[in-house]
């Protein structure tokens, strides 16, 4: 039997079972748990390599082989960290296993044929495209920024750079919803829209859902009253959609307890649970302990650093249409910025008590930094809290799975789209992100939408090869022509699909049906379902989880930052 050293094998085919990789410049290390390929029968493309006629490539016709194969990929997902080939057919993940030619190779379950394109996954980490559930649709250029960061799905609301959208993720009413659906149809990213949920009678809510809203948003700037909350959730239960809420910072319509009473035992997605982004001051963070609340963070407070508090006041004044010359407006802003709850937020994420990460794009948050901020927090917590339960001195696999779930599968589950996106699993859209380990979480090597490359770093177009400087991200073929419609999906409520909205608006993108939003709970949040008893001191803002104070120092230095960016 022939032998090869681990180093030589990793250089040729990528890491295998037991090998370890460092994520970017963090102190996080993954270890490969399983290898689905067959030693000695690996497939690889190139001169003198395996994927050639009669060798790793079979003779079958188009219908019997995959359209795309990603060879020797290291998959990092909530369900595992494994080495495998990934087959893609008709824009969806066909299989995860062993690719090749079954005529001459054993254990092949992904057939490579004349119709198969090859993406080299050797030495790359593959994750599912991110799902950002807190998008203010202030400008369409956010799609490019999000895609080039590794996010492939936007959920939120808005109509452009106007006061309502700068403050709230709401696309209100039939006309606005229809115009925005027609607009986002042209974007190479998956999109779902929130209607306005701040209504105390059901008719205005039903018509928005029937018009194409995939969910509804309750926001204090439109009135987050107990009556609106109760009514909105009634309609959600009736029409199987999710409700997102930014609760009442000023406690004008009621205190935290009144909001919880209005919610009852029904599921709801609470945005920026820490509170700097808005919500009952100072105790909205207690919602982390509710079994029917799906808690989320937005990225401006993540992770807690020496600069976090100072930058927030001015951001808040701009986003919520406040005037620094009005004392009441300044007091409103200051009531939301609390060092103690911001520090506790990091720890709650590490405990798996906050389930989702999102951006709050251009409305205090940064649309291109959801993934970076998630891993910066994971790194900060490892340095400050040590090895997570289930991990060891050799790897951080459990912590890594917990954090990747926050921006992939959990937001997809929360909004009823996990049957389409959110993980690297058979049958789902092939929205995949390839990373060089040294650039993991920072700068993707390839961003694929439905199996076709949407964005990639590309060098001088007039150069003899693709790599000469200047290298920067450019849109690829999934962003052009009719291909962009086949590569992206618009998520709609079941009621709007039945009402024929896609046909009435002549939407050309794929249509995804929102379903299963009302039968979930905090327990549905993978690796992030911990529901501690949260206590908050209203005078000192000290936060306790199950009686233990949640205290950590602000970071003075972060990975995935200046080492990778000039600006």
Curated annotation (Swiss-Prot):
The active site is at residue 320. Residues 129-567 form the Urease domain. Pathway: Nitrogen metabolism; urea degradation; CO(2) and NH(3) from urea (urease route): step 1/1. One of its GO terms (biological process) is urea catabolic process. It comes from the Bacteria. Gene3D superfamilies: Metal-dependent hydrolases, Urease, subunit C, domain 1. Its EC number is 3.5.1.5. It catalyses: urea + 2 H2O + H(+) = hydrogencarbonate + 2 NH4(+). PROSITE patterns: UREASE_1 (PS01120), UREASE_2 (PS00145), UREASE_3 (PS51368). GO terms for molecular function: nickel cation binding; urease activity. Ni(2+) 1 binds at residues 134, 136, 217, 360. Keywords: Cytoplasm, Hydrolase, Metal-binding, Nickel. InterPro entries: Amidohydro-rel (IPR006680), Metal-dep_hydrolase_composite (IPR011059), Metal_Hydrolase (IPR032466), Urease_alpha_N_dom (IPR011612), Urease_alpha_subunit (IPR050112), Urease_AS (IPR017950), Urease_asu (IPR005848), Urease_asu_c (IPR017951). Pfam families: Amidohydro_1 (PF01979), Urease_alpha (PF00449). Its cofactor is Ni cation. CDD domains: Urease_alpha (cd00375). One of its GO terms (cellular component) is cytoplasm. Belongs to the metallo-dependent hydrolases superfamily. Urease alpha subunit family. Heterotrimer of UreA (gamma), UreB (beta) and UreC (alpha) subunits. Three heterotrimers associate to form the active enzyme. This is Urease subunit alpha. It comes from Aliivibrio fischeri (strain MJ11). The lineage of its organism: Bacteria, Pseudomonadati, Pseudomonadota, Gammaproteobacteria, Vibrionales.
């Amino acid at each position: 039997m022939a032998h090869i050293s681990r180093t030589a094998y990793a250089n040729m085919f990528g890491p295998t079972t037991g090998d370890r990789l460092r994520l970017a410049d963090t102190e996080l290390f993954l270890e490969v748990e399983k290898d689905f390929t067959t030693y000695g029968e690996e497939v690889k493309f190139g001169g003198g390599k395996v994927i050639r006629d009669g060798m790793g490539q079979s003779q079958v016709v188009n219908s019997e082989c995959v359209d795309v194969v990603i060879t020797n990929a290291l998959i990092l997902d909530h369900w595992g960290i494994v080495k495998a080939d990934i087959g893609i057919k008709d824009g969806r993940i066909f299989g995860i296993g062993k690719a090749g030619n079954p005529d001459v190779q054993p254990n092949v379950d992904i057939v490579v044929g004349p119709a198969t394109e090859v993406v080299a996954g050797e030495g790359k980490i593959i994750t599912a495209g991110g799902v950002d559930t807190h998008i203010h649709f202030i400008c369409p250029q956010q799609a490019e920024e999000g895609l080039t960061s590794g996010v492939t799905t936007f959920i939120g609301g808005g109509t452009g750079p106007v006061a309502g959208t700068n403050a709230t993720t709401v696309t209100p009413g039939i006309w606005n919803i229809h115009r925005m659906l027609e607009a986002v149809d042209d974007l190479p990213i998956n999109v779902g829209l929130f209607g306005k949920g701040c209504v105390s009678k059901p008719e205005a809510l039903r018509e928005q859902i029937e018009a194409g809203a995939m969910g509804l948003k309750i926001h204090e700037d439109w009135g987050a009253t107990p009556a609106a909350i109760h009514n909105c959730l009634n309609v959600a239960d009736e029409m199987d959609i999710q409700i997102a809420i930014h609760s009442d910072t000023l406690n004008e319509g009621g205190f935290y307890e009144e909001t919880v009473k209005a919610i009852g035992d029904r599921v709801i997605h609470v945005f920026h649970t820490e509170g700097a982004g808005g919500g009952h001051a100072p105790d909205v963070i207690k919602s982390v302990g509710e079994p029917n609340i799906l808690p989320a963070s937005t990225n401006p407070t993540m992770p807690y650093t020496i600069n976090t508090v100072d930058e927030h006041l001015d951001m808040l004044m701009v986003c919520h249409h406040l005037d620094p010359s009005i004392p009441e407006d300044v007091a409103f802003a200051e009531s939301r910025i609390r060092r103690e709850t911001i520090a506790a937020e990091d720890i709650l994420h590490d405990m798996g008590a906050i389930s989702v990460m999102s951006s709050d794009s251009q409305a205090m948050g940064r649309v291109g930094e959801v993934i970076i901020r998630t891993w910066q927090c994971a790194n900060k917590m490892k340095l400050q809290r040590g090895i997570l339960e289930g991990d060891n001195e050799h790897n951080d696999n459990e912590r890594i799975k917990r954090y990747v779930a926050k921006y992939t599968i959990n937001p997809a589950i929360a909004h009823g789209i996990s049957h389409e996106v959110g993980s690297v699993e058979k049958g789902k859209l092939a929205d995949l992100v390839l990373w060089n380990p040294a650039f993991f979480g920072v700068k993707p090597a390839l961003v694929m939408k439905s199996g076709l490359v949407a964005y990639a770093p590309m060098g001088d177009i007039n150069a003899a090869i693709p790599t000469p400087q200047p290298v920067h991200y450019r849109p690829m073929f999934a962003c052009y022509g009719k291909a962009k419609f086949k590569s992206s999906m618009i998520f709609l409520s079941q009621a709007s699909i039945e009402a024929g909205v896609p046909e009435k608006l002549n939407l050309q993108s794929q249509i995804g049906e929102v379903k299963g939003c009302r039968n979930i709970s905090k327990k549905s949040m993978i690796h992030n379902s911990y529901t501690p008893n949260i206590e908050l001191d209203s005078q000192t803002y000290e936060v306790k989880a199950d009686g233990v104070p949640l205290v950590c120092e602000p970071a003075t230095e972060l990975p995935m930052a200046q080492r990778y960016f000039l600006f």
